Amino acid sequence: MKERLKNFHHSAVFICLILAIVLDVVLEALGRHSLFKAVEYVWDQPLIFLYNCSIIFFTLTLSLLMRKRIFGYCVISFAWLILGITNCIVLGFRITPFSAIDMLMARNTITIIDKYFDVWQIVLIAALLFVALAGVIILFIKSPTVTGNIYRTRTTVFIVATFFCVMLFTKIALNAQTISDNFANLATAYNNYGFVYCFSNSVVDVGIGQPSDYSEDKMLEIKDDLDS
């Protein structure tokens, strides 16, 4: 029995790995509006592609703590696909790719959504979101449950180790200038470094930090100097 559970755990990790690779190819195809360009990117930038896969892989490993692992795989994969599809749609209206700041501005986006979509398109999007939500609920109910010991402590250690590996890969890639965390042009960065890394970076880095000497009086002083 222990051997079977061990083999299942290993197969679960393998599933996470395969899903990560497939998801990254799909996300790049959506962002580039071309499967051919996505494959070309994988061929030209294999290390960056694998690095992006490692980020997705880490998120998928969280499902290993769940007894309903298939549900976990699907929800996490669905979340990435939603981000990728949103990026694909956004790039149809503007040059700048989808980033975390857009999510923070979601309330403002709702007020102007009619400027970008027709009524039938808005209704279709709402219907698709409803179907997706219903699908998630049904999947949770119907998906099989892992029985027996899922080794939470060992699995948690593995997930934490995976996280630190991703952080280490990031540090090495930055030092080697394989990737950059300073995006002069967001569209170029997404094209060169991949959607997953760039979007993840936008979650962590939401803009320029506030200077230590910043204050309202300081801003008024600068304004007076400019006006004089």
Predicted regions and their residues:
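Transmembrane and membrane-interface helices of multi-pass
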Residues: 2-190
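Soluble catalytic regions of membrane-associated enzymes that act on cell-envelope
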Residues: 173-228
